C-alpha cells in the first residue's frame, strides 16, 4: 500500500524546519583570553606564596551564551580566565602557584602555601545587532572562596568586568567585548584582594 503526501504538507513541513533552524541559530566559538595584566611592582608585593585552584574539569567546562542575529557564542570561561586570575594574584603576591584540588592540607603546607583561592566564574553576553553574531556586550564575574593551607575559610572576594564593542570595532576580533570584560575583571580582582586586610 502506498500513501501520497500532498505537496502543501511538504512545503509546510519544509518551512517549519527552516524556521526552526533559523530560530535555533548557530553557535560561534570565541575566546576571552586577554594579554593585558595589572602592573606588578616587586617593591609592593606581599611576601606570601598563594595558590589558586583550577581542575581539568573546570578548564573543560564550555559555556554558550547569546550573541547577535539569533546566534550564540561558545567559550571556556575557566580556561580563558585562568591567566586573568593568575595575573590578578601576581599583581599582589610574590609567588603564585596552581593546585588541582583545594583539599590537600598536607601538600599545601609542605609547599609553603599561605592562602588558597578557589574561583567560581559566571558569564553572560548579548548583542544589539540583528545582522551580526558577535556579542556587543559581555559580563564576567568571579567569586573566590579564600582558605588557609588547612582548608579553613578566611574570606571571600568578588570581582566583575563588563565589556562592550561596536560592529565597526570587531575587524575579525569577534571576542572583543569578552576580552574587554576580562581585562576589567582582572584589574578589579587584584584591587579587591589588595583591599582586604584578611589577605595581607
Predicted feature locations:
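A structural "domain/chain start" motif
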Residues: 26-88, 192-200
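Structured loop/turn residues at beta-strand edges in well-structured enzyme cores
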Residues: 21, 45, 111
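Sec-dependent bacterial lipoprotein signal peptides
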Residues: 1-26
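Surface-exposed short loop/turn segments
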Residues: 27-35, 101-154, 165
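Mid-chain, structured segments of secreted extracytoplasmic proteins
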Residues: 79-105
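Generic short beta-strand segments
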Residues: 55-60, 120-126, 160-162
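Short secondary-structure boundary motifs at beta->alpha junctions and helix caps
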Residues: 68-77, 147-199
Amino acid at each position: 500500500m502506498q500513501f501520497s503526501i500532498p505537496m502543501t504538507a511538504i512545503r509546510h513541513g519544509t518551512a517549519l524546519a527552516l524556521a526552526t533552524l533559523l530560530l535555533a541559530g548557530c553557535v560561534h566559538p570565541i575566546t576571552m583570553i586577554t594579554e593585558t595584566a595589572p602592573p606588578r611592582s616587586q617593591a609592593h608585593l606581599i611576601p606570601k606564596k598563594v595558590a589558586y585552584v583550577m581542575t581539568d574539569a573546570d578548564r573543560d567546562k564550555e559555556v554558550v551564551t547569546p550573541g547577535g542575529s539569533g546566534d550564540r557564542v561558545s567559550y571556556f570561561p575557566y580556561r580563558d580566565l585562568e591567566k586573568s586570575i593568575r595575573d590578578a594574584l601576581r599583581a599582589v603576591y610574590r609567588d603564585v602557584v596552581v593546585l588541582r584540588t583545594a583539599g590537600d592540607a598536607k601538600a599545601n603546607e609542605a609547599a609553603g602555601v599561605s592562602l588558597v583561592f578557589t574561583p567560581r566564574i559566571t558569564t553572560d553576553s548579548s548583542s544589539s545587532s540583528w545582522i551580526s553574531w558577535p556579542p556587543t556586550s559581555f559580563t564576567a564575574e568571579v567569586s573566590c572562596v579564600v582558605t588557609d593551607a588547612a582548608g579553613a575559610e578566611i574570606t571571600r572576594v568578588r570581582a566583575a568586568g563588563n565589556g562592550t564593542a561596536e560592529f565597526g570595532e570587531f575587524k575579525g576580533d569577534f571576542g572583543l567585548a569578552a576580552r574587554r570584560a576580562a581585562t576589567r575583571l582582572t584589574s578589579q580582582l587584584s584591587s579587591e584582594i589588595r583591599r582586604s586586610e584578611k589577605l595581607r
